[in-house]
A protein has these predicted regions:
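A structural signal for short, well-ordered beta-strand segments and their strand-loop junctions
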Residues: 22-23, 86, 97, 101, ...
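The catalytic Nudix box helix
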Residues: 39-41, 47-106, 130
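Nudix hydrolase/Nudix homology domain
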Residues: 63-70, 106-208
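A generic short-segment signal for beta-strand/edge and adjacent turn/coil regions
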Residues: 5-8, 94-102, 121-125, 142
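Conserved N-terminal beta-strand and adjoining loop/helix that marks the start
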Residues: 1-22, 27-58
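A generic fold-level signal
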Residues: 4, 16, 31-32, 76-78, ...
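Residue-level marker of positions within ordered structural domains that often coincide
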Residues: 14, 44, 94, 135, ...
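A structural signal for well-ordered alpha-helical segments within the folded catalytic domains
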Residues: 6-7, 79-87, 168-175
């Protein structure tokens, strides 16, 4: 089974003393990863390629997205992943990105990780994880709302989350992004990109 392209977003709130990230619990009705906490996200749809935007991703992010693919990827396809992440963010949490949500500014988005579901699972995804701070996107953290897709939404302290039943890949991505922020609190667009995949039965936690 070939993995489906997907996108997810780590939305970070730095308005308090402790940086927080938005997570929610997947519905028990989901076939793939039910009842675990994850970041907002989902599959890239064909329509995501034609969604409007105000400003593009940074050249560094576009370049890394096109390199982080099992097959040749165009700028349009790479951009569609970012637009898919923002579409899913709105659908699952009610949050709108930027001053003009119908034409989002993609330039604040960083590309921080890529995870490929191992073979043999009921669903397989090739997920690219984006990251952004709420103040950069004009987002009020208090405006989140649950949805059928993502419930029990909460802002989680990025350094104090061991008690939450998070999907293993979600926890790994959060751990690595938290480590990146120690040396680079603003997460520049040139920051490293983690990759998680399985090769010949061995789990690989490497870099792009």
């Amino acid at each position: 089974m070939r993995p489906k392209d997907a996108a997810s977003i780590l939305l970070l709130d730095r308005s308090t003393d402790r940086t927080r990230v938005l997570v929610g619990k997947r519905s028990s009705a989901h076939v793939f990863m039910p009842d675990v906490y994850v970041f907002p996200g989902g599959r890239r749809d064909a329509d995501d390629r034609t969604l409007p935007f105000a400003r593009d991703l940074s050249p560094a992010v576009l370049d890394k997205l096109m390199r982080a693919s099992s097959r040749q990827m165009t700028q349009t396809s790479a951009r569609a992943l970012a637009l898919a992440a923002l579409r899913e963010l709105h659908e699952e949490t009610g949050l709108r990105f930027g001053a003009d949500p119908d034409r989002p500014d993609l330039s604040p988005l960083r590309f921080v990780a890529r995870a490929i579901t191992p073979p043999g699972r009921v669903r397989r995804f090739d997920t690219r994880f984006f990251c952004c701070f709420t103040d950069e996107a004009g987002i009020d953290p208090n405006e989140i709302r649950d949805s059928d897709e993502l419930q029990n939404l909460e802002w989680l302290d990025i350094q104090n989350n061991s008690s939450l039943n998070m999907a293993p890949i979600t926890r790994m991505v959060l751990e690595d992004v938290t480590k990146f922020m120690i040396g680079d609190p603003s997460l520049q667009s040139e920051s490293p990109v983690r990759q998680y995949f399985e090769r010949r039965g061995n789990f690989i936690r490497g870099f792009l």
